Amino acid sequence: YTVPHLETAPYPIISFGQGCEGEPLLMWETIREAIIEIRKHTQKGSININTNGSKPMAVEALMQAGLNSIRVSTNSARPDIYTRYYQPNNYRFEDIVESLKVVRRYNGWSSINYFTFPGMTNSVKEYEALRALIRETGLSMIQWRNFNIDPDWYLGKMGVTDTGECLGIPQMMALIREEFPELKFGYYNPPAERMLHFDTDFAH
């Protein structure tokens, strides 16, 4: 069904990893073979992976096979805040940064699934870290995601009692957009057509 979908559907996209089925990079060899087989039959459509970005070498192998885009989930652009929440096993925050950089080196589309928590996400420290992440990775898109989490639990887990100086969320977004005009904001992984012409209305 995958190849006919990519061949005939309007603005087709397929994804590995949907957030509720485990980390797809743990099966990257299988995914690579699947992408190779798909691309034997069609070059149409976009192949995406939703991931924690923990294996840059695996991401590179998938890009070589024909992957088009990646979405890496993170609660923060700061290594310490990321680590307290994700408690990564056998990888570090630096690995997800490298995965984003790998995708851009292959001219792919790189997004972060950015869990947005007012009082943390819009702190001045986070804003500065996000700017640095965008510059370092050449990020294509931020998917600003409402962080559906118990706030008391989260702040306790982060060990945060004072978030420091904060911007408003709209102000932070406006400042990021002004500094990085090529960076896109959104909520979903775009199809290949929208990657090329992002401001075109593809909903109708």
Q: What is each residue range found by the language model?
A:
Residues Y1-E33, R39-A58, A65-I96, S140-Q143:
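Core AdoMet radical
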Residues G19-E21, N52-S54, N75-A77, F115-F117, ...:
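Active-site beta-loop-alpha junctions enriched in small/polar residues
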Residues E29-T42, E94-N107, T163-F185:
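Alpha-helix-loop-beta-strand connector modules within alpha/beta enzyme cores
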Residues I38, L62, V103, L133-I134:
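Generic structural signal for hydrophobic
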Residues A65, Y106, E136-T137:
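Structural motif
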Residues Y86-N89, S99-E126:
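Conserved strand-turn element in the central/C-terminal portion of the radical SAM core barrel
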